[in-house]
């Protein structure tokens, strides 16, 4: 996969078949969200939150985002904000 920026890789995570756990009678697949660039499914929500705010007009170029977080959502927001040029303040 080639991407123009890291945000294009969010959500393009592999599907992996679980072969031995359930035998041949069931076909179980998992989506490996840890393969997102920030290492978490929270990359998806961070991108969705920022893009929704942009589309609604609530977030404009040069804006500062302030978000309470103590985990992976903050990592995702930091990555998306950096690529899109927003300042980000994370608080607990």
What is the role of each PLM region?
Residues 1-92:
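PLP-dependent amino-acid enzyme catalytic core
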């Amino acid at each position: 996969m080639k991407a123009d920026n890291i945000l294009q890789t969010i959500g393009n995570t592999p599907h992996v078949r679980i072969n031995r756990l359930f035998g041949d009678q069931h076909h179980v697949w998992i989506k490996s969200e840890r393969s997102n660039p920030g290492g978490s499914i929270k990359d998806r929500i961070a991108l969705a939150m920022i893009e929704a705010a942009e589309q609604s007009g609530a977030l404009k170029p040069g804006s500062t985002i302030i978000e309470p977080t103590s985990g992976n959502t903050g990592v995702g927001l930091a990555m998306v904000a950096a690529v899109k040029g927003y300042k980000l303040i994370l608080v607990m």
